[in-house]
């Protein structure tokens, strides 16, 4: 019973965690200036830590690992977009003024 309960809770946690990368992927169409670099960095670090945790526990939680891999990709993509905007696009906008 305890193992079944643990697996169910692990699955539900991973399922709920999918809302983070889904939201991030949906925001890829928004302006990069709206990206919060502190929160995005925090989410990237969070996912990196929990990717490791998801495979370190017994039994490994591959659902959670997949979720955090997707979130890591999403957050790093957002940070890349923000960095590109900050270095190139915002400088061009200030030069125009």
UniProtKB/Swiss-Prot annotation:
The chain crosses the membrane at residues 9-28, 38-55. GO terms for biological process: mitochondrial pyruvate transmembrane transport. The keyword Transcription regulation does not apply. One of its GO terms (molecular function) is pyruvate transmembrane transporter activity. It is found in: Mitochondrion inner membrane. GO terms for cellular component: mitochondrial inner membrane. It comes from the Eukaryota. It is a multi-pass membrane protein. Disulfide bonds: none annotated. Keywords: Membrane, Mitochondrion, Mitochondrion inner membrane, Transmembrane, Transmembrane helix, Transport. Pfam families: MPC. Belongs to the mitochondrial pyruvate carrier (MPC) (TC 2.A.105) family. May mediate the uptake of pyruvate into mitochondria. This is Probable mitochondrial pyruvate carrier 1. It comes from Dictyostelium discoideum.
């Amino acid at each position: 019973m305890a193992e079944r309960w643990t697996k169910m809770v692990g699955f539900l946690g991973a399922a709920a965690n999918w809302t983070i990368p889904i939201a991030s992927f949906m925001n890829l169409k928004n302006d990069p200036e709206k990206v919060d670099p502190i929160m995005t960095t925090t989410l990237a670090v969070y996912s990196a830590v929990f990717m490791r945790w998801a495979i370190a526990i017994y039994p490994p939680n591959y659902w959670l690992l997949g979720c955090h891999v997707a979130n890591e990709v999403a957050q790093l993509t957002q940070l890349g977009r923000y960095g590109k905007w900050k270095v190139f696009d915002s400088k061009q906008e200030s030069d125009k003024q």
